Amino acid sequence: MSRFKISLPALATRVAVLGFLTLMASVLGGCGAGQISQTATQEPAVNGNRVTLNNLALRDIRIQAAQTGDFLQSGRTVDLMLVAINNSPYVTDRLVSITSDIGTVALNGYTQLPTNGMLFIGTSEGQRIKPPPLQSNNIAKAIVTLAKPITNGLTYNFTFNFEKAGQANVAVPVSAGLAPRQT
């Protein structure tokens, strides 16, 4: 037998293995490449959710409650926290109501959103930085009377109804708030 007849099957095997490895490298490498990068956008480091409706932006939406047991029981009241921003330079808006499947939401205070202005709903516990001076008409309160038990780690559906912008639906998490560090 000539040496070409002996090494030809070995060469074909090597070429096939090398081709297979090259194909697998390109397939697996292509899984991470794409037109939309998963790390190209920055997300806010806040506890709450967010939603944008036309020129209105609702940010850091969360239920603020300290949970000591397995659930926050029905009948209890908890605070709904958020910041509403009106990005329109021409149109004022007003938060008419908030509804949820976990209970009734009572809005108290001035709920008008001025042009290019903000509306704070609730006051954050444990704020380390003093906020800029706010007028009393920039702060409202939303109190949720629970109709069913809720717990940390889950989100609950809320609908925000605005006079001009319409409705925005968002899943709102329960924020445990500031608690002493466990040791």
Swiss-Prot record:
It is found in: Cell membrane. It is a lipid-anchor. InterPro entries: PCuAC_sf. Its main location: membrane. Keywords: Cell membrane, Lipoprotein, Membrane, Palmitate, Signal. Residues 1-30 form the signal peptide. One of its GO terms (cellular component) is plasma membrane. A lipid is attached at residue 31 (S-diacylglycerol cysteine). It comes from the Bacteria. A lipid is attached at residue 31 (N-palmitoyl cysteine). This is Putative lipoprotein LpqE.
